[in-house]
Amino acid sequence: MSKLDNYQFDTHPLFDDEFNKIINRHKCPTLKEDFERLKIALVQYLEDLNRFPVNICNRIAGLDSKVKFPAFIVKNFRCKGINKGSRSGFRITFLFSREDNLFYFVEIYNKNKKPVEDKERIN
């Protein structure tokens, strides 16, 4: 049984649209594979360290008090298809519910086209 089986992964409807646009526009055919690798890494760190490492993702500050779960942003996303290592420029925001072991991916974007995450979508 894989460690991933203990966790649920869900996405915001707009996340799926953005994900597909990045595959087509940026000609990044490995994005699906890279995203799966990110999921494995997040679960691995969570299982081994009981936290997310700050060199991969940071907690997002300044959110509404309505937000029930902590929100994180992955800043060092490795994309094989772009050949820049962790400096691909992609950002991924997600919420994590420890009680439900649920990752909810909210947004994916390129930092060169959009400098900051959409806090309205997270709220």
Give residue spans per PLM region:
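Basic, Lys/Arg-enriched alpha-helical interface segments
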Residues: 1-86, 99-102, 110-123
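Short, surface-exposed coil-to-beta transition loops
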Residues: 86-92
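Short, low-complexity Ser/Thr-rich regulatory SLiMs
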Residues: 94-98
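Short glycine-/small-residue motifs
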Residues: 105
